[in-house]
């Protein structure tokens, strides 16, 4: 299996990819290095495909990978309560239905100027 090491041990690399994947699902666009963007593209595409399947097994597989972070909060004045949506809920309720008619290619990578300081090639990865 071909993958990039990204200058980290395997556990650090897996944790970083999980974090970046979750951040992309929450924010729908992030700025990172080109190598990281190309790596998280694989995992995000898999998560959206699981979201499109939508069954219990797919939800559990996605829950095992995506971090349990709050994607959005809203306040309901009528009931005087806050409601929050996690990244997993957003994946299955908002993102996956958006790509119901699309077979892959859910992300776009746009190259930007090199990072100041170490001139690392930077990119913006976003959901199409």
UniProtKB/Swiss-Prot annotation:
What family classification does the UniProt entry report for this protein? Belongs to the bacterial ribosomal protein bL17 family.
Q: Name one GO biological process term.
A: translation
What domain of life is recorded for the organism?
Bacteria
Residues forming coiled coils: none
Can you supply one Gene Ontology CC term for this chain's record? cytosolic large ribosomal subunit
Pfam assignment, any one: Ribosomal_L17
Q: What is this protein called?
A: Large ribosomal subunit protein bL17
Instruction: List GO molecular-function terms, semicolon-separated.
Output: structural constituent of ribosome
Entry keywords, A to Z: Ribonucleoprotein, Ribosomal protein
Species this protein is from? Streptococcus equi subsp. zooepidemicus (strain H70)
Q: Which HAMAP family match?
A: Ribosomal_bL17
Q: Spell out the subunit comment.
A: Part of the 50S ribosomal subunit. Contacts protein L32.
Task: Please give the Gene3D superfamilies that the UniProt record associates with this protein.
Answer: Ribosomal protein L17
- InterPro entries listed in its UniProt record: Ribosomal_bL17, Ribosomal_bL17_CS, Ribosomal_bL17_sf
**Which NCBIfam families does this UniProt record tie to the protein?**
L17
């Amino acid at each position: 299996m071909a993958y990039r090491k990204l200058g980290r041990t395997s556990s650090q690399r897996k944790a970083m990819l999980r974090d970046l994947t979750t951040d992309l699902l929450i924010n729908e666009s992030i700025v990172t290095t080109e190598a990281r963007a190309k790596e998280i593209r694989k995992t995000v595409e898999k998560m959206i495909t699981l979201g499109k399947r939508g069954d219990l097994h797919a939800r559990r597989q996605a829950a095992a990978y995506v971090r349990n972070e709050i994607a959005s909060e809203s306040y309901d004045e009528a009931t005087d309560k806050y409601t929050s949506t996690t990244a997993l809920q957003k994946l299955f309720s908002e993102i996956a239905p958006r790509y119901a008619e699309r077979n892959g290619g859910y992300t776009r990578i746009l190259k930007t100027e090199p990072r100041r300081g170490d001139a690392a090639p930077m990119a913006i990865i976003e959901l199409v």
